[in-house]
Swiss-Prot record:
PANTHER family with a match to the protein in the record: MATURASE K
Pfam families hit by this protein: Intron_maturas2, MatK_N
The protein, known as: Maturase K
Organism encoding this protein: Cardamine amara (Large bitter-cress)
Regions annotated as coiled coil: none
Role played: Usually encoded in the trnK tRNA gene intron. Probably assists in splicing its own and other chloroplast group II introns.
Domain of life per record: Eukaryota
Sorted UniProt keywords: Chloroplast, mRNA processing, Plastid, RNA-binding, tRNA processing
Example GO BP: tRNA processing
Entry's Gene Ontology molecular function annotations: RNA binding
HAMAP family noted in UniProt: MatK
Subcellular location(s) of the protein: Plastid, Chloroplast
GO cellular component, one term: chloroplast
Name of the gene: matK
Length: 504
């Protein structure tokens, strides 16, 4: 691996050639199947681990396919021969899928090596907790309480895949690999037009790499402006919107600023900015004025449209005032709550009452969206009335009960950071009654007769689990009080959003 690592290293200027020649080298098989590389990444590749891909994709088949394509001296296969033109028992659609899978694995090799070297020893153990979704909420509670405005941006998806390929030109200097990438993408979708399947296997790893490259280029420009502006505390953002003649504009601005506008120095100071990206959205939190927030909105719209050729509507950028509006963030509704405090101060014989206001970030449970998800998965109707889960009636009673209990515990576990947990009672009620109706439907009985026959102890597991964990964390006296249901608990083992559809 040390021999390959030197070959795959990136230099600081990012002027390296791409990894396209690795398709024709024998030791790519060693790299693709080396377990040490996967341990560096801590996440084994879909190409190597997924059972559906293990039996189908092979770098050896890819090499044979490429050699065959060059021997035929034609890369475009006629559409009428799609069914007849088989290679190793597969059709042409499979060829481009297979090449794109291996292509995604290869381009991730240098990133895996770089990531592995940065997390050596105990550094990876310390950073593992930071992977939890809940780890960001304590940070937001500490930082957002000092800010007043948030820019909620929906990152646009390119309509055409050619835009994604063109984005790679800024980082990839090997023209042959870009042509090969473009060829695979176009031929893959040309085959899809004639090979329509209800459940066709796409390559999420390949398109995720293209999308991340697209977003990374956008963020590099944004961070460039942010980094430059952080060293110019008296410079307006208005000057930083364009990259052309950047330093010339800064120098000219200083001349105008010193001569004519010394009184507005405080208004143009660069505030602190926090940037968070998640699930195709980004948040820009700052303590700006409404005028500067509108300028940031104008900047994002023009950046996507002019620089990336992506149509971006201004309606996708929302300016929210945290004291008035709710911010939808990772399944929570977050907003700033003002807690008035009255402090009595006594000095000698005189006493004073001091009114103080404490700003706190409040994270609430979006009860309507959760009920909507439950209704989508047929646990209840759109009004929140429980219905039986007909598709589960063929399972055993213990299996049905375990599924409902698992979903209920996952929801309680994820929304433990809310200060108002009473909304969870309604979710638990829907799941409990849905479970009873499902079991009663399976046994061809009514809900009343089913509960009378088995007793209420059947649903005790819905009331335990999360409560048992809380009883171990807090003292008994504190646990018995009602204050426990107002305490926020952030767990460091939640690595993904709980999807109600993922209940199998």
């Amino acid at each position: 691996m040390e021999k390959f690592q030197g070959y795959l290293e990136f230099d600081g200027a990012r002027q390296q050639s791409f990894l396209y020649p690795l398709f024709f080298r024998e030791y790519i098989y060693v790299l693709a199947y080396d377990h040490g590389l996967n341990r560096l990444n801590r996440n084994r590749s879909i190409f190597l681990e997924n059972a559906d891909y293990d039996k189908k994709y092979s770098s050896l088949i890819v090499k044979r396919l490429i050699l065959r394509m060059y021997e035929q001296n034609r890369l475009i296969i006629p559409t009428k021969d799609l069914n007849q033109n088989n290679f190793l028992g597969h059709t042409s659609l499979f060829y481009y899928q297979m090449i794109s899978v291996l292509f995604a694995v290869i381009v991730e090799i240098p990133f895996s090596l770089r990531l592995g070297s940065s997390f050596e020893g105990n550094l990876f153990k310390k950073s593992y907790n930071l992977q939890s979704i809940h780890s960001i909420f304590p940070f937001l509670e500490d930082k957002l309480s000092h800010f007043n405005y948030v820019l909620d941006v929906v990152i646009p998806y390119p309509i055409h895949l050619e835009i994604l390929v063109q984005t790679l030109r800024y980082r990839v200097k090997d023209a042959s690999s870009l042509h090969f990438l473009r060829f695979c993408v176009y031929e893959y979708f040309n085959c899809k037009n004639f090979y329509i399947k209800k459940k066709s296997i796409l390559n999420p790893r390949f398109f995720l790499f293209l999308y991340n490259s697209h977003v990374c280029e956008y963020e590099s420009i944004f961070f460039f402006l942010r980094k430059r502006s952080s060293h110019l505390r008296s410079t307006s953002y208005e000057v930083l919107f364009e990259r052309i003649f950047f330093y010339g504009k800064i120098q000219h601005f200083f001349k105008v600023f010193v001569n004519n506008f010394p009184a507005i120095l405080g208004l143009l100071k660069d505030p602190f900015i926090h940037y968070v990206r998640y699930h195709g959205r980004s948040i820009l939190a700052t303590k700006d004025t409404p005028l500067l927030m509108n300028k940031w909105k104008y900047y994002f719209v023009n950046l996507w449209q002019c620089y990336f050729s992506v149509w971006f509507q201004s309606q996708k950028v929302h300016i929210k005032q945290l004291s008035k509006d709710n911010l939808e963030f990772l399944g929570y509704l977050s907003s700033l709550r003002l807690n008035p405090l009255v402090v009595r101060s006594q000095m000698l014989e005189n006493s004073f009452l001091i009114d103080n206001v404490r700003i706190k970030l409040d994270s609430k449970i979006p009860i309507s969206s959760i009920i909507g998800s439950l209704a989508k998965d047929k646990f209840c109707n759109v009004l929140g009335h429980p219905i039986s889960k007909v598709i589960w009636t063929h399972s055993s009673d213990s299996d049905i009960l375990n599924r409902f209990v698992r979903i209920c515990r996952n929801i309680s576990h994820y929304y433990s950071g809310s200060s108002k947990k009473k909304f969870l009672y309604r979710i638990k009620y829907i799941l409990r009654l849905c479970c009873v109706k499902t079991l009663a439907r399976k046994h061809k009985s009514t809900v009343r007769a089913f509960l009378k026959r088995l007793g209420s102890g059947l649903l005790e597991e819905f009331l335990t689990g999360e409560d048992q964990v809380l009883s171990l964390i807090f003292p008994i006296s504190y646990y018995a009080s009602k204050r426990l249901y107002r305490v926020r608990i952030w767990y460091l083992d939640i690595l993904y959003l709980n999807d109600l559809a993922n209940h199998e």
